[in-house]
Design a protein with these regions (language model features):
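Structured beta-strand/loop patches that form or line metal/cofactor-binding pockets in enzymes
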Residues: 1-48, 53
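Metal- or metallocofactor-binding catalytic centers and their adjacent structured scaffolds
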Residues: 6-7, 41-122
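N-terminal small/glycine-rich loop or linker at the start of catalytic domains
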Residues: 98, 123-147, 181-183, 187-189
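Active-site beta->alpha loop and helix N-cap motifs at the rims of alpha/beta catalytic domains
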Residues: 125, 147-154, 160-162
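Active-site mouth loops of central-metabolism enzymes
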Residues: 138-153, 195-202, 245
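Non-catalytic positions within long, well-ordered alpha-helices that form the structural scaffold/packing
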Residues: 162-165, 213
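Catalytic core of soluble alpha/beta enzymes
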Residues: 171, 176-258
């Protein structure tokens, strides 16, 4: 059996310009994007690559990969596609003391992705074919804008996205005027989504949804704080529009079901 000989994190830093948006960590402007690439080496010379979330915490994620994940995986057999879930479950169980979300899961996810890449390389097929048969040859992409805050600038960025060929827009705005500005800029036929990043309580989220109803958003994503308030997340859609809680709640499939 092919064995894992090492798991190593590589930090990649890319200069970044947010343009008209205010892309900050606290009061500090973010001018670089940090990516943590996870390399899984084997005794057969085949290497798998993954991506561990390192947004503003690349050192922490990389350290978790090198000092928590690598010792757990080193020396184990390389799983095939069917064996990856059980392999990753073992890793999660061994490291559950360090948290079921946050840095630990960021590092674990990088290993998970790398194992899928490795499994495809061993089979000699593209990863998409290993996962399953293709249902379509083209996938539509939407423009996911940063939080901008000013209606006029939001409208301008939406128009720029359309000129670049995007056929749907996702905002990260939390005020009704900015959402209306986007809808006016893109017209009635373009899908519009709003990702809010958990700023409101249930009453505020419901009021915001009603205020934006005329813009016909496909969904409001992460409107409620705290993101694990499942009861409120279930209540707001009954009084407003569709809510998509998404990534801040997900640990495998448990919270998705909730």
């Amino acid at each position: 059996m092919m064995l894992i000989t090492n798991v190593k994190a590589h930090r990649v830093r890319i200069p970044f310009n947010a343009g008209v948006a205010s892309f900050k960590q606290g009061a500090s402007a973010i001018t670089e994007l940090d990516i943590v690439i996870v390399e899984v080496s084997t005794d057969a010379g085949v290497t798998g690559w993954g991506d561990a979330f390192g947004y503003v915490c690349p050192r922490s994620t990389a350290t978790a990969v090198d000092e928590m994940i690598a010792p757990q995986a080193r020396g184990l057999g390389v799983p095939d596609a069917e064996g990856i879930p059980a392999f990753m479950d073992r890793i999660q169980r061994n490291l559950h003391l360090f948290g079921r979300y946050g840095i630990t899961m960021f590092a674990i996810s990088g290993l998970d992705i790398a194992l899928w890449d490795l499994a495809a390389r061993v089979k000699g097929v593209p990863l998409h074919r290993l996962i399953g048969a293709s249902k379509r040859m083209r996938i539509p992409a939407y423009a996911s804008l940063l939080r901008i805050g000013t209606p006029e600038l939001v409208a301008g960025e939406c128009e720029t996205a359309l000129r670049r060929g995007y056929t749907a827009i996702k905002l990260h705005e939390t005020t009704a005027p900015t959402v209306f500005a986007a809808r006016q800029a893109i017209g009635a036929g373009i899908p519009l989504m709003v990702d809010m990043n958990c700023p409101m309580d249930g009453t505020e989220a419901t009021a915001f949804a009603h205020a934006c109803r005329a813009t016909a958003p496909m969904f409001l994503e992460e409107p409620v704080w705290p993101p694990e308030d499942f009861a409120t997340l279930a209540e707001v859609p009954r009084r407003a529009v569709l809510i998509l809680p998404r990534e801040k709640m997900l640990v495998r499939f448990i919270n998705s079901a909730k």
